[in-house]
């Protein structure tokens, strides 16, 4: 029986195995059926073969296609990333980029008052030069004559180019125009003086020397030079120096002397120069320990406001200015001292959170990123951003409730305008949906992008709780007050923030939230938020102190700003991590920090120097634009003038400023009036353009052309030449007009009718003293080109000289041959040097000292920081 039973068991086992195999076969059949149905329905094309190798190849092909598709995906991804990078680069190009922050700071600090304009020489365009005199037969006489010539003769040919030369000359005068002239500093000894007298500068001395040694100088002039010396009137602090100047140069220097920018300096001026709020701040003790002499002088800084309104429609330029101001402000915000130990604070926080007992992930996040460096960085960022009116963006993690609760303090203290709208909305929405609405069991807020109201404004209308709604109302209406102090527009914080009372309002709202039931949320969620609120509320006193400290440092440094604080959202933003705000709230100690007097003075000086330089460069640009228009420089690119203006401000990357802003800047500059000094200087140049042209050896003022040969005439300055000294009796045609219209018919008709014609305009004045080359060039260069090709712009009139210096002088001696030319160069006579008319007495102060750093005379100290008081006469930090 037993045997039989064993066999039966075996059979049963075999049967079971068969069944299992059958099941497997069925499964395989089903799989194959599904695979077949898939293959039939799928649109993929497959080749069915019996050959195993081909099947392997097909698998490999599949693998390779997969790899190719992967590679293609990667390529597409990189292409997308590349496109994003390109888009970002395009965006960056519309925003001027900056060099490292240190270099901007150095550029700003290196802008000094214009001490470089202190002159050691008088301004001169002309210098006297000796030229030989020629007799009637063309021979050079032994005696010479003095004429006024240009010191730097770079006059180009062509009327338009000459006018451009005068614009460049004007620009040069503007850069060299001294703020003050002290003749004693440049006076030198007159070598020919009997009693060691002095003349005004080294060039006057060298001119006197040359005239004294000239054999033809009259005895009376020599005696006069021997008498030339300074005349001092000590009781009036005045000295007169003799000078030898061309009348135009004299007009310039006399104007500079009469319109100096220096003003008398005394203790009152220095004390009033210090910003009023710092003078009246009881925390700063200012003292002057000496009186200034009566000869002390200073240059009043030019602090006009908002002449170009760069905040209005100049996004890139405004971004650059605010960035440089931000970097400067960060460098002067004091570092926090005696912060709470990070380890000790984290340990205390973890005890408060009971993290040993509870290991809730969200609560361990509360402690991440807390460190003293982040706290200090946050303090500096907040104050510097408000001082420079830089827009901030917030970076946060929604699950970190602690950073959101810290964000509630931040939004209470800092006005809404300081944050980029999208970032502000995101942060407010996170606070509403994570803390405020769950506390009252309200449904999540579904915020539509583009809604004119912020999440807090919507929440204020929906929440019934008075304390929470009251706090939301304060945040929604937290704006800067615009106040003009000492003529500067300041962005002032709300009084409730300045005295710290608003923190009590925030705490009342937080306590109300922590008492709520969070009905729709789990218990752990409610506990997490309650503990986060508890952590912040435990530091109520420190938060009040921190708010007062922030406001005091902001307002004290704000007193040193000289340009209007215009509030406009900036293109780029300063990033602020909410974890660093948590660090600041949790680690702030009880040590007061206030800016040192030296830091304040430095900040004030840098701001004054930049602002003054900004206004002076505006004046220069406006003057150059006006001059270009009055000189009819129709081809002058105004953009180049604007680029120069921006370069001279030092902080701009000019190549990256968009063109639309360049042209808008040009239009704004055109509307401004020209400063009086610069206008007077331009009028001086404009009135004397003719005299300056005459003194040039490079250009003539026109050319007379004719069919018939015109005889060469004797000229005192050159001998036998084809020069005409006047245009009487000739019909005149303006060369520039002729070249612009291109109508040469009038000239050719006149020439064909045997009438000489005078082409008036700035032409090259080239000397060619060889008679042979004169004859060779005559018809080929001048006459043929005018009549046949009708091209006036290629006309190169030549000054032909035939005199005793010439190797071919024997041709002149041969009276059978009369030298002639078909052109006559029209050249005006330069002004002759007359010693009596060129001797001028210049008057200036005998002595004075110009002080550039006025605050160097003020010794300043502060009270002990612990005793420093805020505007309400209460200590800044009360929590000890």
Swiss-Prot record:
Residues 1-43 are annotated as: Disordered. Residues 19-30 have a biased composition (Basic and acidic residues). It is found in: Virion. Keywords: Capsid protein, Inner capsid protein, Repeat, RNA-binding, T=2 icosahedral capsid protein, Ubl conjugation, Virion. GO terms for cellular component: T=2 icosahedral viral capsid; viral inner capsid; viral nucleocapsid. Residues 394-414, 422-442 are annotated as: Hydrophobic. GO terms for molecular function: RNA binding. Sumoylated with SUMO1 and SUMO2. Sumoylation of viral proteins seems to have a positive role on viral replication. Homodecamer; each decamer is made up of two conformers of VP2, called VP2A and VP2B. Interacts with a VP1-VP3 complex. Interacts with the intermediate capsid protein VP6. Interacts with NSP5. Interacts (via N-terminus) with NSP2. The N-terminus binds RNA. It is necessary for encapsidation of VP1 and VP3. The N-termini of 10 VP2 molecules form a cylindrical hub underneath each 5-fold axis of the inner capsid. Belongs to the rotavirus VP2 family. This is Inner capsid protein VP2. It comes from Rotavirus A (isolate RVA/Human/Belgium/B4106/2000/G3P11[14]) (RV-A).
